[in-house]
A protein has these predicted regions:
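Intrinsically disordered, low-complexity segments enriched in small/polar residues
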Residues: 1-59, 68-119
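Extracellular Ig-like/FN3 beta-sandwich strand-entry sites
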Residues: 61-63
Length: 119
């Protein structure tokens, strides 16, 4: 036999991004669970119109949190009712809790975008 069957066990991940669809630049903080089950808050600065956060953390947890605010402080994306308070940008902020949509009970792995829009 020339070739031997090889089996690979690969792990699947979520990659989370926030896309800015607001005409003002924003700062974004995302709180994600790492593959070792610890949690980390990652901050992204000065995300311009139609740009997205870069270099997100790999996670195999379908729950994540995010907070965003315009640089001038006039608008923000946060949840004081169902959210969670965590440190971001040197202050305690209210983060949105989000969960990845499941299709027919199956987890949708890969890239997931949250849109920050303003009028």
């Amino acid at each position: 036999r020339l070739f031997q069957r090889v089996r690979f066990d690969t792990e699947q991940f979520h990659y989370f991004y926030v896309q800015n669809r607001c005409h003002k630049p924003i700062n974004v903080a995302m709180r994600l669970q790492l593959t070792d089950n610890s949690w980390r808050t990652q901050e992204f600065y000065d995300i311009g119109y139609n740009e997205r956060t870069e270099g997100t953390i790999e996670s195999n947890n379908s729950i994540y949190y995010y907070f965003a605010k315009t640089l001038d402080g006039s608008m923000g994306w946060f949840d004081e009712v169902n959210g969670k308070q965590k440190k971001a940008f040197g202050r305690t902020e209210w983060f949105f809790r989000k969960e990845i949509f499941r299709e027919n009970g199956q987890v949708l792995w890969g890239d997931h975008y949250t849109i920050a829009e303003c009028e």
